[in-house]
Amino acid sequence: MLSSRIPKGKLLKQTSATSYLNLAKSMPITTARYRPNQYYANELAKLNVFTIHNIPSPCFSQVRNFHSSFPRKLQMQQTEQGDNRPALEKFGSDLTQLAKEGKLDPVIGRDHEIRRTIQILSRRTKNNPVLIGNAGTGKTAVMEGLAQRIIRGEVPDSMKDKQIITLDLAGIISGAKYRGDFESKLKSILKEVEEKNGKVILFIDEFHLLMGLGKAEGSIDASNLLKPALARGKLSMCGATTIEEYRKYVEKDAALARRFSPVTVNEPTVEDTISILRGLKERYEVHHGVRIMDSALVTAALYSNRYITDRFLPDKAIDLVDEASSTLRLQHESRPDAIATLDRQIMTIEIELESLRKEEDQLSIDRKHKLEKELEVKKSELKELTDQWESEKRAIDAVKNAKSELEKAKYELEQATREGDYARASRIQYASIPELQDKIQELSKNELAAKSSNLLHDSVTSEDIAGVISKMTGIPVNNLLKGEKDKLLDMNILLRQSVVGQDEAIDAVSDAVRLQRAGLTSENRPIASFMFLGPTGTGKTEGGKSLAQFLFNDKNAVVRFDMSEFQEKHTISRLIGSPPGYVGYEESGELTEAVRRKPYSVVLFDEFEKAHPDLSKLLLQVLDEGSLTDSHGKKIDFKNTIIVMTSNIGQEILLADKNTYEDGHINSEVKSQVLENLRHHYAPEFLNRIDDIVVFNRLSKTALKEILDIRLREIGDRLVDKRIILQLTDEAKTLLCDMGYDPTYGARPLNRVLRKKLLDPLAMRLIKGQVQENETVKVEVKDHKIYVVPNHSEGTVIEKEEDYFKEDKDDN
């Protein structure tokens, strides 16, 4: 036993616990040769205490029991934790070995970055590249591509037979409880690398974590431990980090930064991303057991670039394909809806049959026979569908297994070629692989032949990609997939259903949106920007909301700002956030945060002329470049927003009777006067960036009647829950229009009239019981006033159906 080899302590005359502890501390620990590793000094110090003879029981009542089991527990710990592997093997992962085993995804493109990395690694000193790029652009893939090239021998002679080891920084730092533990681990790694004589390239992902790693009181961090080896060229290291983290952490340490040569990994183009997706397609098909259509790959690249603006290609496009494939795979593993529906119907019939089993009347017997026949038919349908589902699953699994075998055969071909076994390589290339390809083609052909009647959808299509986009961004799928031609041609008609009497404004908005959708405007600008001018109550704000309904299928997709809150200059900072040193710096800007959370919305600046003039300067970048930088330095994307500014500038010109026709329309001369008035308020560079300035007409009586119909439909929607139908006579509608018509105030007086003359009396009728649920309410004119006709006398209460049955049950 281990305890028998530890030197025995001397007998003490004192009986205090402190005396025994002091003795244990003074005893030399000479058992290092019995330990499999160097991290058990603390446990052996404890064991020294327990090996002291004649410890009085009052001092340590449980010491003797623990002493007998401690060596065995220590040996178990040593068995579990002891690890005599080399440090590189313990704390690293061999990328070249993974590439040799075919476990790395193929790397498409990135030739320039890989070649630049090889050039730096081939230097005599400071042969340390650091890959810098945005998250998701493929920095780690560059090193994986280099590992694959080393295995295939597609590198210069100086790079052949080299190993790329990925260091696990978390594994190095974990367990380093005492001062010196971390340093000894790292030094052992560096020693092993130097012993390899330049055959090992260390790769550290999240390279900026080296700064301060292992830093504690009286110790130095990892970056300072690495500097001497990096400078001498004895250590070849490659790092990967983002641009922001490199600037924030690495560049501050000039001594470390100069030992590395940056390699910029830029975001690939959409075309390059499509090529990358095509290269990864087979891996994802084998993993998920589905077929990925080429159109889905193109859609993933295009839609991710257009709609996911806070991430980078190719990562976001790969995620779309992966999630769509995963969703389809889960559908294969779950029961189809048709089978689940039949199963529920069978359960319902069986429950009803059980309740009718004891009934003896003729009606129940007939019902029971009918249900038994129906149950038999349903069970037959269920069995047929279940057999079909299992058959389709087997067919899909067969294709998946064949593709897996094909991938394995390709790996074996590459391995045989690399090892020089050309006979085996020939058999695989000209026999096994063609046979598997024919098998996959035949299985896929059988699937396509029965596709019309299939329960399972086995191909990832553009619709599946659009569904994932919809979940991630909130854009309705039908907006992405519906033919843009039909939708845009109907835009004028759809907008006129909610914005009345403003045909010219609707046409201007529709034309601007069509221009953008046709791709004839700059992609770096917002979808469109408008300034709506006109008298109050003419539908300027409603126009912005209707635009949101058309584009985003959500009338609430409007980020609205009341400009009366931004009259002072200092309040403008609320939109982008307070500068450093001011109260509220930690909080995000109201405008930037709203657009970041809802990037697909209509941004409405209501009553724009009431804001401070400097606000127009803030919007110059938004209108021209489609972006705005907040107080934290984050760039917010406005490319998928529509900017709408409403203003009452020039309304005194529009309200003059001599300047408008009877139908409320204005002529071009009056419009020119309004625009001239606008130029006195805003700088030319601001007005020049707005796509279109729309002048709204004054509302006519005809337009007000259409608005009344819209408001009555809205009131009817509110009464649906009470199952009340509202009916107005033509006379009542005409009287309401006459009472609510005021050219100066637009449609808002009509809302007040409806509330005072219609809704308030209707509320009184409901409260008094004169109008009940599930009834029709008539509204007519009586004595030249709006009159809501009561259906019952005051205080009348009709029993509800459930109350009637409740009373009947109580009587029984």
Curated annotation (Swiss-Prot):
Molecular-function annotations in GO: ATP binding; ATP hydrolysis activity; misfolded protein binding
NBD1: annotated segments: 88-336
Stated family: Belongs to the ClpA/ClpB family.
Annotated positions binding ATP 2: 534-541
Domain writeup: Has 2 AAA ATPase type nucleotide-binding domains (NBDs) per monomer. NBD1 is primarily responsible for ATP hydrolysis. NBD2 is crucial for oligomerization.
The protein's role, per its UniProt record: Required, in concert with mitochondrial Hsp70, for the dissociation, resolubilization and refolding of aggregates of damaged proteins in the mitochondrial matrix after heat stress. May extract proteins from aggregates by unfolding and threading them in an ATP-dependent process through the axial channel of the protein hexamer, after which they can be refolded by the Hsp70 chaperone system. Required for resumption of mitochondrial respiratory function, DNA synthesis and morphology after heat stress.
Protein's organism: Candida albicans (strain SC5314 / ATCC MYA-2876) (Yeast)
Keyword ATP-binding assigned: yes
Residues that coordinate or bind ATP 1: 133-140
Gene3D superfamilies: 1.10.8.60, P-loop containing nucleotide triphosphate hydrolases (3.40.50.300)
Protein name: Heat shock protein 78, mitochondrial
Location relative to the cell: Mitochondrion matrix
